[in-house]
Amino acid sequence: FLPLILGKLVKGLL
């Protein structure tokens, strides 16, 4: 998993 995708997922959840 790329950091960009992970960040997007975290932002989407939050």
Curated annotation (Swiss-Prot):
GO terms for cellular component: extracellular region. One of its GO terms (biological process) is chemotaxis. It is found in: Secreted. Expressed by the venom gland. Keywords: Amidation, Chemotaxis, G-protein coupled receptor impairing toxin, Mast cell degranulation, Secreted, Toxin. GO terms for molecular function: toxin activity. Mast cell degranulating peptide. Induces the chemotaxis of neutrophils. Its mast cell degranulation activity may be related to the activation of G-protein coupled receptors in mast cells as well as interaction with other proteins located in cell endosomal membranes in the mast cells. Belongs to the MCD family. Crabrolin subfamily. This is Histamine-releasing peptide 2. It comes from Vespa orientalis.
